[in-house]
Structure formats: C-alpha cells, structure tokens
Amino acid sequence: VDPAPPRDENDIFSLKSTLCDESARMFLRMRALFSLRNIGGKDAVDALAAAFESDSALLKHEIAYVMGQMQDSAAVPHLIDRLADGDEDVMVRHEAAEALGAIGDRTALATLEEFVDDDAVVVAESCEVALDLLEYVSSKRLNYAD
C-alpha cells in the first residue's frame, strides 16, 4: 500500500508542478509522485527526477523507490547522480542504490561497484544488495528474451 493514493490525473506537467512545490503538503506531493509512477515512461521519470532538487530527504527517498518500481532505464542517470552525491542524505543514497539494482540496467554496474565500500555502511550494504539484484534482474531479462 502506498503512503498516499495517486491522483486521478494524467497531466505530467501539472503533477510535476505539485511534486516540485516545496510549499505543498507532503501528502499532495506524494499523491503526485504515485500518479507519475503509474503513468510511467521517460516524461514521467524526468518529472520525478526534477523533484530530486527538493529539500525533503523523505520525498527524494520515495522518488528513488518508485523509480525502482518503474524499472525504466531512463531513471538510471538520475539515480546514479543521487548515489554518487556524498552530500546527499544516506536514506536517499541507499534507496537510489537499491532502485538501480531493481532496474537491472548493467550501465549502473560500475557505479554500484564503486560505492560498495562507501563510508556510510547503509549505502555500502545497499550497493552490495543492489549488485546481486541487478545480476538477477538482468539475467531474468536475458533468459526471457531467449
């Protein structure tokens, strides 16, 4: 169960506007977040990524989480940026790592390997889990294609 129900709206621009509005209640921002996840596709991913500029670590953590759920490779560069940013909250970095694993795009492999020894234990452990998950997800896709 999501922390907030998605809105009954498919206008990516409007949803992005709500998601990025720092003065909006978190519940409304979360509703926009889950609506964008449900819409899917590169435009929705880009709208979600725009909110990585938020001051809220909770929101950014949820953004990374839903990007992992979406399993869209368009999210990979955005998630790599969050993971690689040593100034980012560890909760966000941890979720970015796990989302990269869930997406299963091998372009994230080198970044996950780089941060498997991160000083933040939760980030390092998340990268370790993500590496195994990435291998699993990418091998399932390869086997499915055969």
Question: What are these model-derived regions, one by one?
Answer:
Residues D55-A74:
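Helix-adjacent hinge/juxtasegments
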Residues M91, A120-V129, L142:
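Boundary/linker segments of alpha-helical solenoid repeat arrays
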Residues P5-C20, G41-E53, D72-D85, D105-D117, ...:
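Amphipathic alpha-helical scaffolding segments comprising HEAT/armadillo-like alpha-solenoid repeats
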Residues D2, S35-N38, V66-Q69, A99-A102, ...:
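Core register positions within helices of long alpha-helical scaffolds
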